[in-house]
Amino acid sequence: MGAAYFDQFKVVDLIAITNSSMMMMLAVAVALILLKGNRLIPNRWQAVMESIYDHFHGLVKDNSGPQYFPFVFTLFIFIVFLNILGLFPYVFTVTVHIVVTLGLSFSIVIGVTLGGLWKFKWNFLSILMPAGAPLALAPLLVLIETVSYISRAISLGVRLAANLSAGHLLFAILAGFGFNMLTTAGVFNIFPVLIMVFISLLEAAVAVIQAYVFSLLTTIYLADTIVLH
């Protein structure tokens, strides 16, 4: 029974491409459909999206510059739609796979590093040596800062996959428990229904929060390297 909870994370080949690839394409398609079209008088959905847009625009502009806003906002939309789609029954959740999340995080850190080297040349390596530190401690500090810099990519990807995996497992266990209570106590017992509704709302909140944290940390890493804070 316990092994069945992990079957939702299994990568399956479908028509020469995996379910993981199909979900990524579906997330992009759904995002394009839901985000297209602007009305002069916005409806509630457009008002929510404009609020999110304004928030991210201000966040990225203040920390790393407006030129990076399209990338960070697109990253947030992509991850949040992947996370939300994964909440539906029998839908594969791409972001629970460490290979996918580490691929995203390492691509971001490598891209940021190359951008910093292109902009600052060898002066970019000054981020590995804290300002005002004693010269005698330079070898140790450079080693520590190098390990810390590399660990950014690892922690960024692992955090997303681990939190979503734990949430989905908890959701599956409690949903199964609630369904058993529902069939045992009768359809008029509201308690198991409330359990499933609460867990669903909690998982939706976690899906959005984790996408936001991933995008926020990406913005911070951009600020630390591109602006050389």
Swiss-Prot record:
It is found in: Mitochondrion inner membrane. One of its GO terms (molecular function) is proton-transporting ATP synthase activity, rotational mechanism. Keywords: ATP synthesis, CF(0), Hydrogen ion transport, Ion transport, Membrane, Mitochondrion, Mitochondrion inner membrane, Transmembrane, Transmembrane helix, Transport. It comes from Metridium senile (Brown sea anemone). Mitochondrial membrane ATP synthase (F(1)F(0) ATP synthase or Complex V) produces ATP from ADP in the presence of a proton gradient across the membrane which is generated by electron transport complexes of the respiratory chain. F-type ATPases consist of two structural domains, F(1) - containing the extramembraneous catalytic core and F(0) - containing the membrane proton channel, linked together by a central stalk and a peripheral stalk. During catalysis, ATP synthesis in the catalytic domain of F(1) is coupled via a rotary mechanism of the central stalk subunits to proton translocation. The gene is ATPASE6. The keyword Membrane applies. Belongs to the ATPase A chain family. Pfam families: ATP-synt_A (PF00119). It comes from the Eukaryota. This is ATP synthase subunit a. NCBIfam families: ATP_synt_6_or_A. The keyword Transmembrane applies. GO terms for cellular component: mitochondrial inner membrane; proton-transporting ATP synthase complex. It is a multi-pass membrane protein. CDD domains: ATP-synt_Fo_a_6 (cd00310). F-type ATPases have 2 components, CF(1) - the catalytic core - and CF(0) - the membrane proton channel. CF(1) has five subunits: alpha(3), beta(3), gamma(1), delta(1), epsilon(1). CF(0) has three main subunits: a, b and c. Its main location: mitochondrion.
